[in-house]
Amino acid sequence: MLDFNASASLSERIESLIDPALQAENQAQTPRTYLGASRLGAACERQLQFEYAKAPVDTGKEFSGRILRIFERGHRTEDMVIRWLRLAGFILKTEDANGHQFGFSTAKGRLKGHVDGVLIGGPEGFSYPALWENKCLNSKSWRDLQKNKLAVSKPIYAAQLALYQTYLTLHQQPALFTAVNADTMEIYAELVPFDAALAQRMSDRGALVIRATEAGELLPRSFTDPTHFECKFCSWAERCWSTKK
C-alpha cells in the first residue's frame, strides 16, 4: 500500500484527486450565452460586462475545487429546505408543467433568470402566490444578514428578488427569502416586499450592460483603486486594470 503520508497528508491527497475532477466537470459544462439576472446587483457594471462577454478570467482566478464544493453545498441545501418547507405544509412548486425550472427570458434571450420556487399555498399568515429564494451562508455572513436584513446586508440578493418578482408577476405578495447557516443549520427567514424602483434600476442596468457590451463600449469601473476589496476578489481584475480607462 502506498504511504501517502510520506509526502502529503491524506486530506491533501484526497483533495488532490477530487478537485481536478470537479474542475474538469465544471469546465465541460456549456457556458451561459446570456446575462444572468441573479448577478445584476453586483457592485461593478464592468464586471458584468466581462461575465456577459464570457471573457477569460485572470490566471489563477478559475474556480477552485473548494469553491465548487461550496457551490454544490448550496444546491444540496436548497433541496433540503424544499423538503422541509413541504413537510411543514407549504405547497412549493419548483418546476413548470414541462419539468423545467421556473424562470424568465427577456431581451431576446440575452437576459434570463431562474428562480428557486413559487409558494402557491400553505400555512396561515402568509400570502400566496409568492416567490421563494434560498441561500446557504457561512456563520459570519448569516449573522450579518440576521442583524441588518436583506436589503442592507445582501443587496445583490435583494436585486435578484426584485427582478424575479417583476418578471414573473409575483410582485403583489412579499417574497419569502430563507438563508441557512451552513455551520449551525439555523434558518433565517424574511418577507421581502416588492421594490419597484429597485427592479426598474436593475432592469435598466441589464439593458445597459448588454447594449454597451455588444457595441464594444467598456463601461466605467465602479472603483478607483485596484486594491479595493471588490477588485481584489474580481476574476477579471488584472484584465480590467491593464486598460487605461
Where are these regions (language model features)?
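Conserved active-site beta-strand-loop modules that form the wall/rim of enzyme catalytic pockets
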Residues: 127-134, 172-177
